[in-house]
Swiss-Prot record:
It comes from the Eukaryota. Its main location: nucleus. Keywords: Meiosis, Nucleus, RNA-mediated gene silencing. The gene is MEL1. Essential for the progression of premeiotic mitosis and meiosis during sporogenesis. Regulates the cell division of premeiotic germ cells, the proper modification of meiotic chromosomes, and the faithful progression of meiosis, probably via small RNA-mediated gene silencing. May be involved in histone H3 'Lys-9' demethylation in the pericentromeric region. PROSITE patterns: PAZ (PS50821), PIWI (PS50822). The lineage of its organism: Eukaryota, Viridiplantae, Streptophyta, Embryophyta, Tracheophyta. This is Protein argonaute MEL1. The keyword Nucleus applies. One of its GO terms (cellular component) is nucleolus organizer region. SMART domains: DUF1785 (SM01163), PAZ (SM00949), Piwi (SM00950).
Amino acid sequence: MAYRGGGRGGRGGEQRPPYSGRGDVPGRGGGGGGGGAPPYRPASGFVWPPPGMTPRPGPPQPQYPRPGPPAVVYGAPMPAAHHQGAYQPGGVYRAPSPGVPVIGGYARSTPVTIRAPPPSHSSAPAPYQPAAAAPAPSSSSTAPSATALAKEFEQKLFVSETALAPPAAVASAAAAPAGEASVESDKDLAPVSKKGLAHPARPGFGAAGKKVMIRANHFLVNVADNNLFHYDVSINPESKSRATNREVLNELIKLHGKTSLGGKLPAYDGRKSLYTAGSLPFESEEFVVKLIDPEKKDKERAEREYKITIRIAGRTDLYHLQQFLLGRQRDMPQETIQVLDVVLRESPSWNYVTVSRSFFSTQFGHRGDIGEGLECWRGYYQSLRPTQMGLSLNIDISATSFFKPVTVIQFVEEFLNIRDTSRPLSDRDRVKIKKALRGVRIETNHQEDQIRRYKITGITPIPMSQLIFPVDDNGTRKTVVQYFWDRYNYRLKYASWPCLQSGSDSRPVYLPMEVCKIVEGQRYSKKLNDKQVTNILRATCQRPQQREQSIHEMVLHNKYTEDRFAQEFGIKVCNDLVSVPARVLPPPMLKYHDSGREKTCAPSVGQWNMINKKMINGGTVDNWTCLSFSRMRPEEVQRFCGDLIQMCNATGMSFNPRPVVDVRSTNPNNIENALRDVHRRTSELLAREGKGGLQLLIVILPEVSGSYGKIKRVCETDLGIVSQCCLPRHASRPNKQYLENVALKINVKVGGRNTVLERAFIRNGIPFVSEVPTIIFGADVTHPPPGEDSASSIAAVVASMDWPEITKYRGLVSAQPHRQEIIEDLFSVGKDPVKVVNGGMIRELLIAFRKKTGRRPERIIFYRDGVSEGQFSHVLLHEMDAIRKACASLEEGYLPPVTFVVVQKRHHTRLFPEVHGRRDMTDKSGNILPGTVVDRQICHPTEFDFYLCSHAGIQGTSRPTHYHVLYDENHFTADALQSLTNNLCYTYARCTRAVSVVPPAYYAHLAAFRARYYVEGESSDGGSTPGSSGQAVAREGPVEVRQLPKIKENVKDVMFYC
């Protein structure tokens, strides 16, 4: 019985790979589920697929039970899309009955007849006016007007848990004057339930493009028919260490496995859950085991007793998993999949270092030195996933940073780049070391017959030659140096350095660095600097053929067929990568200005150039100047500016060759003063001549990093200057490609367009977008690096400001609580004594779209980046609610249809050509061709998702982007959404290459990273906030969110984040 269920992208116009954080410094190079299944349980087992049944060719078709006597509901909110179970007037459907538990993924239902309210004869609502302010309604329970209900029904609002409630209880307040509606509180448009926001079923498979076969790093998994039992495990005394818990359970299995456990071999998750194939011979039992700690000298302290309680928690079989994989059940049986995943992770958890879903070991290859006391370990990622073809094991090659197992003295020398160890450490050095080593385990080596291990909690503020502590109960006090000489006859050499501290502040243990060595196998979880990132990428970069071979060898090395836990649970893993049908979508035709020799362009293998082309809308720069903080000579700076201006004019811009004030060089130690001075001088001069303000400031950065963030913060939030930063190593020897990339960036920063899709100028040329005014959003949240427990997360939302071109994007940013993924400021409600004040980023961007285009958006497409699968429902629930409220606050009944798509780049699916080396199947780097899309076999069994590799690789293995539609009121077909997403990837402003992530999501990521500079500046020691002590602060309660400085309006009007 069986279940069958990268490399970096293009670099155009930027110094780092996509999503690197710095977005301004250009670089070289090119640019309703099915009806309920009967509650049947097989007596002996089942076969997957069932006898005589072929794998499912398409998405499941809903099967509705026979309706009983209908209930009549007027204007009840219903699902938004036909494939989500949209309801039509006059039809009899079944709605969830309140308070009835879900059985097999579906709740019992009550027949409901939906009747539309009588149509309104009033005139259409007036277009919303941004300046209008609606007075607060006198009561939030005011019955909605017929017009509002008709509009709500027409737009097909969400299904909520109040589907059978009276209309007045579920409709939004509509007591605002025409022109702008008010949303007074959460009672008006309450968040819908997670059950109501069911993800849309796949509308079918795509057919566009050239059909090809490729391979994916997914491996089929067969599972025998077993009853799986879940037991709750309680260990006393409790330990937070998974390793300790595993040792305790392992000792229990050794002592009682063949007796009290009935010969079962359980799988343990290291926390609270134990799983078995078949039941244990008891429902609840207590055991006592003793563990000996070899690091403890005292025998009584070395032996520790643990009491283990095991209780039955539940039972599951594979029936619901079978139904889910067949498409007959929409709710994924997460617990069943988790059991099987834990089983397959049990053996490697014992043998390797576990980091999240990856396993690392020195067995997997050479440890590469990445600098500053760190090294790179190789390993593999493993995750069990339900797919259209059945269960598959996704396996990929991984690498991460570990502490080198060296003495602490050696680590400090490398980490701080110290050459003279006789000098004391500065306060800054001490803080950096304290931050890096906090929580690290070390072992002492000053006693030959005994090795003791400790965990570092801090570093002493004074040198150990001055550090005095009591050594006995008589009050005798000694320095650490004196104590080591008297007690161990050990002369300490680094007396001017501080000590490491273990234990608590009340009972500290002082450890001289020179007697301590870092224990092997500890991951470095802090933020890596640019050099370390480059080193780790260089050490792990593999071309597709090499990576595929490495993955295959890893599967063979793991020997899943011989794994005793897999055998216990009847799991078998295929050793070969699966073959997957795919399609290569054609690239779009791009439109350039008619004054160029080439008016249109057909990209070739995901790239093109600006030869014989002019920007479709070249920007104008009349007022500019340049400020150099580098060591470049003045004549070199002037030559670079001249070359850059010449390139801008040649590619279609109108760029005045004369600066407002002379180009000057200045001291990099006075950056802020220099920026204010040039702003004052240019403003005074331009004011006298009546020529407006400074449009562009070209900045040559210093050779030493650390000033970029300050420059951007001052220019964009204080002075209102659009700036273009350039690295001196590029500006001193610019090539044509570099100048072209900078020109592309400057053009969009001053309001121009570089290119647009040719079909944007054809009536209905872009399906779904050209038909009605459409706004495309991109949203992302960036979180502070590990260890910064008090720093805010930053959300960014961008939205297209032109229709039908869809190329200009306005960006907004907002700070929010630490590591909160849901975007708070999509919609907000504030009150004053007179009126309700609505705000938020979505609302502001909708108003800006209206100002720019003269039309209100009639369709919304929302690309949301950075959401993991476990957060799908939570994010959708709150953010769709915010989008709805933002729209409703602008105009009565204004609820345009929304398509909500999650963009995932942080996954481990890799796609490989069927035949490596064939030029008709690969790009120059050996990767699959740009435009390759996959929506079969390795994708979700029922939901609307696909993988798209839209870019051509440069080095390493390309990572496709995963797009998952969480809500779709626009009823996209698979071809329409896949083609739109792929085509948009050719409109990225900063280079003449198709990028790997749809541009709205890419721009939101850049804007969020730009905003982090506003609160952090740019730190060279790993992104800590200025003034931080480097100490991770335990947060006992909510930390006040530090608000971002406001971006000046003239800066927000352009794509400043590019």
